[in-house]
Amino acid sequence: MTNPIIPRVGIATDAHQIEAGKPCWIACLLFEGVDGCEGHSDGDVIAHAIVDALLSASGLGDLGSFVGVGRPEYDGVSGTQLLKEVRELLESRGFVIGNVAAQLVGQTPKFGPRREEAQQVISDIIGAPCSLSATTTDHMGFTGRSEGRASVATAVVWKV
């Protein structure tokens, strides 16, 4: 009898404060005319939450242990690069990415018109289906006051 393939699920959140004048990267897409998020990297909350969820699902740590803020080679790193590197890491450890899902929480940018484009971009990077959504918090909390953005993500992987 062979061992069944058992899916592993990871969940993660990411949040960043909005920084006036910084480019706005969300789900590996640049949103023109919208202030971006502060951070050691590009501030892409969706990409970061997905990376964290993939690391969680595979048992390989979290975003902080993966890149860490003390590593200068990751200063300003893009969400695209982080997703590529975590995919390579998972594959090198014998994991396959099943799918990911993430939700943007914030007042801006208007995500709906670019949702399908973002899903395709991330899917192409990770080699697996990606589902994305967005919501506001009806002007409650730091995301509702447009002080920051957040994302929640889940990932399914399995060991081959």
UniProtKB/Swiss-Prot annotation:
Keyword Repeat tagged: no
Which pathway is recorded for this entry?
Isoprenoid biosynthesis; isopentenyl diphosphate biosynthesis via DXP pathway; isopentenyl diphosphate from 1-deoxy-D-xylulose 5-phosphate: step 4/6
**GO-annotated biological processes:** isopentenyl diphosphate biosynthetic process, methylerythritol 4-phosphate pathway; terpenoid biosynthetic process
Q: Which family does it belong to?
A: Belongs to the IspF family.
Q: Assembly and interactions? A: Homotrimer.
Q: Where is this site: Transition state stabilizer?
A: H40, T136
Enzyme class, top EC level, equals lyase
The record's section on InterPro entries has:
MECDP_synthase, MECDP_synthase_CS, MECDP_synthase_sf
Q: Does the keyword Ligase apply?
A: no
Function of the molecule? Involved in the biosynthesis of isopentenyl diphosphate (IPP) and dimethylallyl diphosphate (DMAPP), two major building blocks of isoprenoid compounds. Catalyzes the conversion of 4-diphosphocytidyl-2-C-methyl-D-erythritol 2-phosphate (CDP-ME2P) to 2-C-methyl-D-erythritol 2,4-cyclodiphosphate (ME-CPP) with a corresponding release of cytidine 5-monophosphate (CMP).
User: What catalytic reaction does the record list?
Assistant: 4-CDP-2-C-methyl-D-erythritol 2-phosphate = 2-C-methyl-D-erythritol 2,4-cyclic diphosphate + CMP
State its cofactor: a divalent metal cation
One Pfam family in the UniProt entry: YgbB
What does the cofactor section's free text say about binding?
A: Binds 1 divalent metal cation per subunit.
Signal peptide (from-to): none
Where does this protein come from, organism-wise?
Corynebacterium glutamicum (strain R)
| HAMAP family tied to this protein | IspF
Which keywords annotate this record?
Isoprene biosynthesis, Lyase, Metal-binding
Which residues bind a divalent metal cation per the record?
D14, H16, H48
Single annotated GO MF: 2-C-methyl-D-erythritol 2,4-cyclodiphosphate synthase activity
What are the EC numbers?
4.6.1.12
Chain residues that bind 4-CDP-2-C-methyl-D-erythritol 2-phosphate: D14, A15, H16, H40, S41, D62, L63, G64, T135, T136, T137, D138, F142, R145
Give the protein name, as stated in the record: 2-C-methyl-D-erythritol 2,4-cyclodiphosphate synthase
